[in-house]
């Protein structure tokens, strides 16, 4: 099967693009960690299609996945989409635009950085335009199949010419010693120390000597609760320095 000639293709020479964010926190944190991804050259469709439009283009009653596979087409990787968006080759659509990458809820830890699709296990990465206020869609995860999503197409090239080896992956997770020191310092300076300072100026005489276990536990609770809103940002992982 050949590619439908009515699809307008945009050529991109590839390049290095940053994916993910560094801000941490259960509610307000970014999907991260932020890292550079080296994207090889590709061609992406100028239009985002619905599943119904894809079937009409090829005039076949075949599952979309099979249509794309036999036509040597696929959804764009996050790196390809991000690079095309940054270079203003593509613009907004209504609703959600799906990408080919599948990653766990915990983020990009352990994922390749050479431009290949991330996955294969996890949730599908999306760009959600519905809440965009500045013209930039939100990164998100598609937790279940959604027939209303749209997607662009990328022309496949022989993968052996581009992707080999392990994909130069990110670390599998945050460095444990650094995390332990970070949590200890946050507990002391954000939770425990302020609790003792408050007690020193406001509690009755002798309260600190009698109630210090409660002050420590209260400080630890404050520290743990703060993780909902904030944790120190991770530095961006550069292509030449991902083990920092």
Stretches with model-predicted labels:
Residues 197-206:
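Juxtamembrane "helix-exit" motif on the non-cytosolic side of transmembrane helices
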Residues 216-228:
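Alpha-helical membrane-embedded segments
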